[in-house]
Amino acid sequence: MILDNIKNTRSHRRFSNKKPSEQDILKMIEGARFSSSAKNNQGLRFSYTTDDEKCEKLTKGVMLGGLLKKEVKPTPEERPRGFFLISVKKDTKMPDSRVYLDLGIAAQNLCLIAQELGYGTCVILSYNKKVFEEVMELPEEYDSRAVIVFGEPIDQVKLVDAIDDQTNYYVKDGIHHVPKLPLDTLIIK
């Protein structure tokens, strides 16, 4: 059932050294390709790399696990093994609200496919654009909007019920806990 895949598609920040296959990467982008798009604009474009040297440079351009304590943050050996850079043309006529709506839908589809293929992902909006656009050799006419890191996850992620609306994620006993609000608190009556 798709709900199980959604529950299992979590943000991962620690990865093995296994390099993702080109075939699997293209399947992930195919998931994004078939996403719904505001006015069927389909304005998103995807760059990716699994090159070790580039991935090392790109890792320095993101902060993984900003809320986590230093001792449970990923080590350099646990860095992502791949990066997607999602971009739009600078002269797009789409308002940002639609760009980010499309981006969210496409990113979720890409991450769902990645999880199904055995990869973990983490969608990142706070990254060093200059570093990413240079390392990924993004053509001048494009503006990057998001990063998705990926690889074979080595961290364990567990969904737990939020208590008193506390939703900050944390690591306890080596397991990454992600509090989720109860269903009845999400419904406006």
Model-found features: residue ranges?
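Acidic, surface-exposed loops and disordered segments
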Residues: 1-189
